[in-house]
Amino acid sequence: MPPGDSQGRDEWIGNKQRCRSGIHALRLRDFQTGCSDQQRSLIERTPEGLYCPAADAWIDPLRPVPRALITHAHADHARPGNGEYWAVDSSEGILRQRLGREITLHAMPYGKSFRLNQANISFHSAGHVLGSAQIRLEVNGEVWVVTGDYKRDDDPSCAPFELVPCDVLITEATFAMPIYRWKSGEAVATEIRNWWQGDRNRPSLLFCYSFGKAQRLLAELHAIGVEEEVLLHGAVETVTRHYRQAAIPMTPSRPVSELPRKESLAGRLVLAPPSAHRSAWMRRFQSPQTAFASGWMAVRGARRRRGYERGFVLSDHADWQGLLKTVRQSGASKVYVTHGQSDVFSRYLRESEGIDAEPLSKLTDINQPDSELTI
């Protein structure tokens, strides 16, 4: 345990970080010289997250590290406290807003290769949200791709998914079950328009994730010809500004907070994050109709359990067919599966597709527990 006084604690933390840095330096040296006890994998699991020894960098690290390769700006992938960040240039505004203006960020365009130590790295569109990327890593002619979160469906709010051939694929599996098959964004936007305009006597509150889903809804509504102003919760507005700066075509919008408190909101469509549902913020809306837009609305009973009147199935992740198509088209001889239904999907790939696949948990684990780092 660290000392109780602040000076001693700072020294203890500093020593621990230096110790960790020394361990990572040894890992890189082992990769460069081949001095390890076993052949090194191009990517390994560590307590800090996925680690590429040849680059001496981590992908979407779980803990602060010297070098972080970021797939996209969602909070479960981009965390504060890292020494340097590499990410797609179109994600820069949101990353700095969420992680701090002062972060050291190397903003890269899609497709441009750069070198970190012994690895050649490039970012390729994942089609998930603005600035989302798959990460391609090449070492000595061997290519691995980490998809991060991705989808294969058309989405007017971000760059489309790019297929990246590879030897080894690490794919997400959030919706890796046959029940998950998405309609087009246009079809869902039409359902939403009809729901909203079918009851002009009440406000229509549509709950959705504030980064990615909300902006996609605005873009999908614009694509089907909706030009009536949509009102936004503050958390949605903050992110939407970055999409407008990126010239994403979306239906007009403004923050609810800009309207006079006594103005009637009957007949208006309002986008808000799930955290606002049943909160004090909702007191402003008289007898609203409510709905939630998410891939999870495909699960029977999910809408009712969450307390919404209506559910719209719209996801920014690949559905069952999209996942299968990606694995097949990648040409990968080895597939690791992470997030969601990793056991189910990897087993299906082995037994039905004849593909060498297993959960990411089976990937080489370079485990260095904190107890071994105690000073």
Can you say where each PLM-predicted feature lies in the sequence?
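Active-site-proximal loop/helix segment associated with metal-binding centers of metalloenzymes
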Residues: 127-139, 150, 154-155, 161, ...
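Binuclear metal-ion centers of metallo-dependent hydrolases, dominated by the metallo-beta-lactamase
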Residues: 12, 18, 27-35, 162-163, ...
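Short internal beta-strands
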Residues: 84-92, 170, 228-239, 292
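Short, well-ordered alpha-helical microsegments
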Residues: 78, 132, 154-155, 214-218, ...
